[in-house]
Amino acid sequence: MKKEDVVAGMLAYIAHLREVGRYSTAKSYLDALRSFKCFCGMEEIPYAYIDKERLLLYQAWLSKRGCMRNTVSTYMRRIRHIYNLAVEAGEVSYIPNLFKGVFTGVESKRKKALPLDSLRSLMGTPRVEPEMRRTQLCFCLMFSFSGMAFVDFAHLRKENVKDGVLSYHRQKSGSFIRVEIPVSYTHLRA
C-alpha cells in the first residue's frame, strides 16, 4: 500500500509502533503529526509540500507558540524520519539537505536543583499532618533511590528488593536499574 502523503505515512508508522508496544514513541509521533497538520491547515499533506522553506516556517511557528527547542527538534526529527521512510519506499524523491538549517539536535537542560535547606525541610520535618506524612516518606524514598521517577516508584513490588539492592525496569525506557539501598532503609525488606 502506498502512503503518498505525510499523514498516511505517519499514521501507518504510529500503528506499527503501537503493535510493537512502543506507546510513548507512538504518542510522540502523533503529537508531531497533530502539530504539523495544524501548521499546514490541511488533513492530507503531500510529501511534495515539504520543502526547506516550509520546514523553517514550521520551526518558527513552533517557537512562536512557546515550544521549547527540544520539542521543536523532536517534531522535526519525527517528520524527517517519516520522510526518510518514504524515500526508502520510493514514494518520494530524495532532496539533499532538506533538513539543513532546521534544529534537530538536543539542547541539554539546566538542572533545577532544590536548595539544600529546602531539601532538609522536606525530608526532615516530622511535623507534617498525618495525611501528608506518607507523601513525605515516598518523596524521601524516591530521592534516596537515585531520584527515582514517581511512575517507577508506583510500580515497585516487594520482589524488587533483594539482598539490599533494589532492581526494576524503568517504565519510560524499559532499561534495567539496580540501586543499592542505603543502610538507613534496610528495614524495608519484606
Model-derived features: positions:
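N-terminal core-binding DNA-recognition domain of tyrosine recombinases/integrases
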Residues: 11-24, 33-110, 125
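Conserved small/polar residues in nucleotide/adenosyl-binding loops
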Residues: 186-190
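Short, charged phosphate-coordinating catalytic segments
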Residues: 84-92, 142-163
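Basic, Lys/Arg-rich DNA-contacting stretches centered on the C-terminal catalytic core
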Residues: 104, 163-185
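Glycine- and acidic
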Residues: 65-67, 136, 167-171
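N-terminal helical hairpins
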Residues: 1-4, 19
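Basic, Lys/Arg- and aromatic-enriched nucleic-acid-binding interface segment
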Residues: 98-150, 154
